[in-house]
Amino acid sequence: MRHRQAPEPGQERHRGIRKKGGRRTKAVSPLSFCGGVCYTQKLTEYQGKGVYDMHDELLRRLNETKTMSIVGMCKNAGKTTMLNWMLTGGHLQGTLGLTSIGRDGESTDVVTGTEKPGIFVKEGTLIATAKDMLRLGDVTKEILMTTGIPTPLGEVVILRARSAGYVQLAGPSITTQLKSVSQSFFELGADRSIIDGALGRKSLGARAVAEGVILCTGASYHMSMEKVIADTVHIYRLMNLPKAAELPPEAADGLEACVKEHGAALVTGALTDTMVLPLLRSGVLRRCRLVVKDPSKVLLSADTLDKLSAREVALETEEAARTLCITVNPVSAYGWKFDKDEFLHRMREAVEVPVINVKEELA
């Protein structure tokens, strides 16, 4: 990834917006394409004078999204900090429903041994968690319903916080269960459903679970800033694959045959380098469409994605959620840290969504 000179004071902070003749126009990064199809989201409309406020754009995106998930690429990525900012800062409108895939909210990270921020909720928040977690929080609880969803820590129940306080979460682990819990939240009066995603669960990008994804990354992922940025952008690209137009049923009858016959193929399982590279070498994959169920089914390297793009192969998905924002933490749990300004600037250069430093901008 190329280094770019930092903008002069007073210039736009976000690469997605440039001024031209007093108006704002969109600047599209080469990273915004896969197979020649632009899949970035429109950042903002021109609203007159003044400097573009990334926080305003972030709040707009969050408040227009009913179901969202927060996915961490590594430990200490700032996921809980972002979650607490959403839950308690008055930034999201209406009643919130909260659950987690896996356990979260404990005070110490069992992997790194570092102290973690607890999950703090406001009075009125709806929470779905396992029964064994109820004794660990300090909120006053009103049990609203049982779900019949089993976990190693007991059945998942839905409660309403009758006071502000800390909670610990252990929610469902299956997509259909998460969808069911979100639906229950809305039936009980929630305006928004938030899923605290487990580490590396890219499947939370599926439309069946969430409309939008908050991607959290940081220095704990790797000592190399270059690698952290490159891998984060790779995940961002996959999460933002364009939604596919409907394909005929016969488009699922074999990758090579369907591409030759229809110029498009529906890949029913995982899409891997082993499947794709031979077809690239043979010239079969050129100016065609490959459709997968959701981004979690794409197991391609960044290099292979670039090769598909060069051959004008459009990679699309039946179910997808857009990336709402990316949060970065320049401080690692393992003792190293990045230059915060360089890390933030380079990440903003590489993507077309708001990028927030959780250490400073969510205080």
Predicted regions and their residues:
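Solvent-exposed alpha-helices and their adjacent loops that cap or buttress functional pockets
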Residues: 60-64, 75, 91, 119, ...
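Conserved catalytic-core segment of NTP-binding enzymes
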Residues: 174, 178-350
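Short, basic, glycine/proline-bearing loop/turn elements
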Residues: 67-73, 160-171
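Low-complexity basic/metal-binding stretches
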Residues: 3-18
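A generic structural motif
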Residues: 98-101, 289-296, 354-363
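Positively charged N-terminal leader segments that act as targeting/secretion signals
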Residues: 15, 20-37, 43-45
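Walker A (P-loop) phosphate-binding motif
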Residues: 55-92, 96-101
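N-terminal phosphate/diphosphate-binding loop that engages ATP/GTP or pyrophosphate donors
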Residues: 86-159
